[in-house]
Amino acid sequence: MNQIKSNRELYLQYSASAPKLLAHVSKLLIFCRNSGISIPKGIRNIFEFTWEELINDPAVPTASEIQDLVVTFGTPTVVLAEVIPVQVLPMQKKQPPPAPPPTLMPAATSGGKYVPPTSTSAKLMPNGQNTLHKFQRQSIHLLTELLSLKMKAMVESASAGANPLDITKRFVEASQLLHLNAKEMAFDCLTGTVGKSCLSTAQLGKESSMNISAMGVNTPYQLVYQTSTACLSFSLCTGKESRKKDIGAKPKPVDDVSPQPVRARTPPENTVVELPDPCPEAREKLQDMCRHIEAERILWRGRNASCPMIFRNYRSRISSHLMLASKGDSHHPLTTGTQITASAPHQPSSQHAQMGRHSQEWKGPKKPIKLHYTFYDGSSFIYYPSGNIALLQIPTCCRGKPITCLFNDMPNTFLALFNAEGLGCVYYNLKNCCPYVLVLDEEGGITNDQKGYIVHRWSWASKTETLLSLEYKVNEQMKLTVLGQDSITVTFTSMNETVTISVSPKSCPHNVLHDKRPVRRISLMDEKVSKTNRALAEIKKRFQKTVTQFMNSVLLAAGLFTLEYPNPKETETSRVKLKPGSNQDRIRKTSLYQGENHMRIQSARQDSIINETLKEDSILTSLAHVQKKNGKVQVKVLPRGKRREVRSPTRWAASPSDCPLVLRRLILKEDIRAGCKCIVKAPLVSDLELERFLSAPRDPNQVLVFGIMSSQDPTLTAQLQWLMDTLYSHLQQGRSSPCIQCRHDPYRLLRYDLDSPLQKDPPLMVKKFAVIHGMVLMFAGGKLLFGGCVLNGYGFSKQNLLKQIFRAQQDCKMGYFLPDNYKFKHDAFKASRIAKPCGLSSRGVPSQFLGLETEPSMSTYVTNLDDTESTKKPPSDDYEGSVSSVALVDKIEKEPPPSPEKVKPPEIELQPFTKMRRSSKKTAGFKKLNSKK
């Protein structure tokens, strides 16, 4: 309590010495003007200093490596800890009383700009100075009484616990206790001096009329209480001041002007208001505005929002300085221009330029430029002179918890952010590697340089070394000042206007208290624990997914789990109504027979030297560094789980067309709830759903591999059946619904049975492509890519089948497809000699090699375009010999022997064939079978 009382006494002492200081400053200004010394307009009034700025002893700043940053560290003092939190808030409420002093001098010297420059104005300097000095003495006396009344009202309100907003109203009531004798004394002193100066010389009528209009007041002051801003203002002017328009006309006699103030002071004080109103229309409009503002204030008070509204524009103080300069220098026109150009003293001075600039600044902008606007809800806005927002402060839950944003003087440029919890960050206003220059939190703060290195670090709770002060120039107009965790301010200065906003963390009853806020403390151990928890969560998801897939596979194999498919009616309407010729619309450009055959022959010769020691199972994962004679070619086949899938822009959902069995049941209007059961063997495709299955939407780069089977004689296609089953089981391992889950695989394995009861007579494959048992067909996008009995130029094996699928994929990407009317021609080997005792003869060639011809070129397989003779021949003649090799040999023996010119030795004829088949493990078995036959 002793500290608080001493502060009040100190404040009373400052208030008592303020009028003397103001008088001294006024004399100094008069002396500077008379001497022709230009004074800047940005002199700060002593009453604008806050209590914190007056009592704090600024520490010595330390040099910082960051530009525009001044940081001071040291041991925290007791004054900062005890005095600032207690005295900052009460003293901020005591700032309104000193507001009137800045208006004394402009109001007292108003009207000076209307004096035309004359040569005789210099003679009035002594009289004008005496008048000004007497007026200042009376103003100081008035200011002293006002300050004493203000302090008395504040002490009474503080002791009684009244609302601080009612202090100003009490001040108005207390001001009425002033003696009327003091007012009359000031009036007599002022008017007496003016009268003497006016009657002394008859040639100075204009000057006397001007002085009378300014000094002829009925009372020394008139207090006006503004309810919108809760502020007081007083003026030393009367209603006669509105008649300044008559100054330029004829000067009125002194006798007509001087008696009016005398008549105004003789009646009682209550009759002064009865003077004629100079502008009733304007007064009515102002009264309407005041009533509207008061109604809004009452409305917001009901909403628990009692923040006063502030509408502050630029040049509000500049115009008052201009009024002061013009009035004080009415007798010296040359110094007027000097005062106007005080903000730019290095500019050349000229009378005409100065007077022109004076007139322009006096008129001011037609539309006021916004500076600082504050509304009832607590939101505050500060603007640049250009109109862009510099500072934005919006309350969250109440006025005490705002969010503050700082912006640069250009659109969409963010500088800083502060919230009510004490978190904040300040960005560099230029492009740097590290965007943050300052970061604040509950524990402390750090400052970073442009490269991101930490320059300073401090803690609010430190007892030995803490932050004493920090100043950072955010840009040319804004400066951030940090004196503690509870004292963070942003100062905006532009065009001699200064606005200070507090961004300190505050507490409110709607949220957690400031001292109970959770502190963010994340150590290295916590980071490790969080990483471990994330890894465990990922492992848990994988395990659950694997177990779910395994259970679905078991249930699906047991018939206890079925897949849900779309409504059969909707699927039937969208799929069954396809036109028969829709497959022809998907045809791309076809390749010529010569180019296709030449490419396949060359690829077969290059791959003939591939190392056969590679394991067959490793082909599914990768084929790398394949050696050739002239160089190394790297062939990479990624694993099934990591294949680079080339998908079309549209992704297909699960549909019945993915599984041939489900599609067949859908066409037959059977129940499809059983779902897909193609887990062990490749799905069997019949003629009933073949066209629709090929034309169904799927990945255009997916290769459909059809194996032509025979159910009546399984021994003819036993090797192909075993190869398809082995590869299919390895490909679909672990899948609960293979037909749906293989939509994005590079290839699919399918079966086509020529002897199935669901096939037509003849089957579609035989009718369209003239296929036989044991052949392999490959489709992509509904078009044929490959067909034959010999894979990759050698025969049937898993390695050769995968290589042939890879070639088909490359052909599909290049757009090489076989024509739609393409039919395969199957001729037996032409041999002229009888088989040798070893058993190797043309009759012993198995049915899998029925695509070969014994020409000198020894091509892998021969494909001819369908001619007119082949189309007339019935399809039964084409594949009748492929069913049994014995029937084929009998057919060959009945043919006439060839001519001697075409007959070749068997050594020359069979040498390339034996060389090519040397690496095949299946040749020995065929030789033994032929020898037995």
UniProtKB/Swiss-Prot annotation:
Pfam families, per database record: FAM194
Localization in the cell: Membrane
Chief site of localization: membrane
Basic residues biased stretches: 915-933
Region ranges (Disordered): 244-277, 343-364, 890-933
UniProt key word Transmembrane: yes
TM regions (residue ranges): 771-791
Keywords of the record: Membrane, Transmembrane, Transmembrane helix
Top-rank taxon, per record: Eukaryota
One GO cellular component term: cytoplasm
Record's bilayer topology term: Single-pass membrane protein
Compositional bias of kind Basic and acidic residues: 244-255, 890-907
Regions of compositional bias (Polar residues) in chain numbering: 343-353
Protein name in the entry: Uncharacterized protein C3orf20 homolog
